[in-house]
Amino acid sequence: MQIMTSSSTSPTSPTSPLAAAADNGVAAAYFNFRGAERVPESHVWKGMHEKDTAPVAAADADGGDAVPVVDMSGGDDAAVAAVARAAEEWGGFLLVGHGVTAEALARVEAQAARLFALPADDKARGARRPGGGNTGYGVPPYLLRYPKQMWAEGYTFPPPAIRDEFRRVWPDAGDDYHRFCSAMEEYDSSMRALGERLLAMFFKALGLAGNDAPGGETERKIRETLTSTIHLNMFPRCPDPDRVVGLAAHTDSGFFTFILQSPVPGLQLLRHRPDRWVTVPGTPGALIVVVGDLFHVLTNGRFHSVFHRAVVNRERDRISMPYFLGPPADMKVTPLVAAGSPESKAVYQAVTWPEYMAVRDKLFGTNISALSMIRVAKEEDKES
């Protein structure tokens, strides 16, 4: 495997941040995507996961495989109904009319691209550290469990730590540092406010909005305690994109995720009966919303999480910026019975995020769904 290096520092030098990142076992050694003329065996993925064998759906005339588009500009009953329909039938949708300006989205995308264009040693100064949780540049810990590597670079950080975190990348705290941090802070502020607006629409769609409604207190508590994480992805162009995966098929574990993607399409949602992948178009100004597992639990299965993956392009790089929203670690996510089950019974056990992640981690590499493991057994199941 070829290691990405800058012209200024040897990767074998003790002073090289890239060498230090490799030595600490947290950040993987990075393949030089830019100079790749072929795909090395370490990145050949196609067909490894059973979901990867599902075909990619072609656009059909009746729009049956067109990803739903929700316009929230009016915030009216029609928009709420569209949110409910998309979350029930797809688990993901394109969001327009959200109020975040195209200029603001362009600024944050440009800054993400500039980060990934830095020399490898500069990026490696921000490498994930032992005991540093899920923060830093490099491969997220859960991806290291796959036998193959993804065709991607990534950087994860909690919004409150933006300025401290990126002083590692730009230790001189110069103009580049301030421009980057300002763009990320603007993105955080916009997504946080948008998340609260969308949460209100979700609860209204469930018929649980308002302080006097069955879910009113829950909505207020969730809104006031939402936690967030930003993950920047770069999916470089690839000489043989059909043999690699940008990001393996998965569901998000939290409540819901906003994804800003560049105009180059690459995100795909899994549809069933029959299984097929549907590509989300790169619609300028739109954000993608993906429902997560814990929102699936909270809504008692009415709004379902969706498997999604990222594929790469032969000619163009692709930027993707997920903004993850979820509960605090100590909050028990309890199904809102009135939201989903016609029998008015909880379909899932109440669970904290760490408890749920422990179940997911235990089932990694199997075909068993973590949601199925916290499902409350029906009476007929108990008797069989």
From Swiss-Prot:
The gene is GA3OX1. It comes from Oryza sativa subsp. japonica (Rice). Gene3D superfamilies: B-lactam Antibiotic, Isopenicillin N Synthase, Chain. Its cofactor is L-ascorbate; Fe(2+). Residues 225-327 form the Fe2OG dioxygenase domain. Fe cation binds at H250, D252, H308. Pathway: Plant hormone biosynthesis; gibberellin biosynthesis. This is Gibberellin 3-beta-dioxygenase 1. Belongs to the iron/ascorbate-dependent oxidoreductase family. Binds 1 Fe(2+) ion per subunit.
